Amino acid sequence: FVHDGFHSCGACSFMGTASTMQIMAEALGLMLPGSALMPATSKDLRTVAREAGKQSVWLAEHDLTPDKIVTMKSFENAIMVHAAISGSTNSLLHLPAIAREFGIEIDGDTFDRLHRGAHYLLNIRPAGEWPAQFFYYAGGVPTIMEEIKDMLHLDVMTVTGKTLGENLEELKKNGFYDKCDSYL
């Protein structure tokens, strides 16, 4: 166990609840693109923390509140990402609870309906071979969303003040996916 355990600095190094819910927050549009599962030892951590702080101020100045970002469509996107990553089953409790806070009803049938059309794309422990930080280095949530974008609502708003579709296009234009290829 000592040699094969799931070692990590930060959140769990497997697709447990903490890792899954970071990914769900980003998939809902509530985190900056590409920031979920950033390893605690990453040189980019401070930069992304500053960007998140600046973006929080921008969101307040522009009155872009979570209730203007989180919709049924954004939950459907998150559930599709959940299927693609084979996320923690605890999400079946957490996502409906979060949705309820926004006046949105999600139940097991919602997961079942959306998961039936989804593809499993990840090889992350415990169902797969690799630790969770590899997901981050391989492009994280944006890479998964790019792969399944035909199944997503690209018109949903995000914390960037742009739609999901605009975020994915900007990442592609800026070469985000190019730096991730060596991990895929």
Model-derived regions: residue spans:
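Catalytic or ion-coupling anion/metal-binding cores of large enzyme and transporter domains
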Residues: F1-L184
